UniProtKB/Swiss-Prot annotation:
Pathway: Amino-acid biosynthesis; L-tryptophan biosynthesis; L-tryptophan from chorismate: step 4/5. It comes from Haloferax volcanii (strain ATCC 29605 / DSM 3757 / JCM 8879 / NBRC 14742 / NCIMB 2012 / VKM B-1768 / DS2) (Halobacterium volcanii). Disulfide bonds: none annotated. Belongs to the TrpC family. SUPFAM superfamilies: Ribulose-phoshate binding barrel. InterPro entries: Aldolase_TIM, Indglycph_syn_Halo_TrpC, Indole-3-glycerol_P_synth, Indole-3-glycerol_P_synth_dom, Indole-3-GlycerolPSynthase_CS, RibuloseP-bd_barrel. The gene is trpC. Its EC number is 4.1.1.48. Keywords: Amino-acid biosynthesis, Aromatic amino acid biosynthesis, Decarboxylase, Lyase, Tryptophan biosynthesis. This is Indole-3-glycerol phosphate synthase. Gene3D superfamilies: Aldolase class I.
Length: 251
């Protein structure tokens, strides 16, 4: 299930190569995590759409760099109704950092997802967060061990998948929060139909997150109708007034 370099877009290949060389933390972390499932339930009880708003200064699929203080962006997203935040810690291609995540988590009271390309157990120890992203395509057979290692530290692992094979592997590894990525990392193309195709394959007790491609309220509604418990949204929130954009998608 590990992706070979030939299967990946050049930008993704470069990200993955850098991730393999990135050092881990010096000491094992222990996390007292804020519950993401509880946050989702509270948002739905309030009649709003659960959105994980992403603090993403830049990316290979966007133009330019947003120079705003990431903490201020995060606060505006929470003020706009974000259920949780996703914070990039990948430095070279997304402009993220572990320090930004630390500052953001101290400044807000919602769950925070660390979004990075984690390849080994030591990389879990770089920084505390409430959730941690594990990409099934990249970690392959190491997924069960990484899910267990993340939980042992107190993290809530969010396992990202794009295919039926990856979804099967995620469920076999015990994942109870699964992100279905509508973006094909081989071509960087987005198809909301990916979520619609895979979501029915997941058990009802698995919390499903629709990732990538949600640009409008209609997109959000489409993903919710297909079974998304929450939406992870980056560009559509970062492009413009982040508070207003978050409010629009969470209504």
């Amino acid at each position: 299930m590990n992706a070979s370099g030939d299967e990946l877009a050049p930008d993704v290949r470069a990200i993955l190569e850098a991730a393999r060389e990135r050092p881990g933390g010096e000491t094992r972390v222990s996390v007292d995590a804020r519950s993401f499932p509880e946050a989702v339930a509270e948002t739905e009880a309030a009649g709003r759409v659960p959105v994980i708003a992403e603090v993403k200064p830049t990316s290979p699929t966007t133009e330019g760099v947003r120079e705003d203080d990431p903490v201020e962006l995060a606060r505006e997203m929470v003020a706009g109704g974000a259920t949780a935040l996703s914070v990039l810690t990948e430095p070279e291609h997304f402009g993220g950092s572990a320090e930004s995540l630390r500052r953001i988590r101290e400044a807000v009271d919602v769950p925070v997802l660390r979004k990075d390309f984690i390849m080994n157990e030591a990389q879990l120890d770089v920084v505390q967060s409430d959730l941690v992203l594990l990409i099934a395509r990249f970690v392959g057979e190491d997924l069960p061990a990484l899910v267990e290692a993340a939980r042992d530290r107190g993290f809530q692992p969010l396992v990202e998948v794009h295919t039926r094979e990856e979804l099967t592997a995620a469920l076999a590894a015990g994942a109870d929060i699964v992100g279905i990525n509508n973006r094909d990392l081989g071509k960087l193309e987005v198809d909301l139909g990916t979520f619609e195709e895979l979501a029915p394959e997941a058990p009802e007790d698995v919390l499903l997150v629709a990732e990538s491609g949600v640009q409008t309220v209609d997109d959000a509604r489409r993903m919710r109708e297909a079974g998304a418990d929450a939406l992870l949204v980056g560009t559509a929130i970062m492009d413009g007034d982040v508070r207003q954009n978050t409010e629009t998608l969470t209504q």
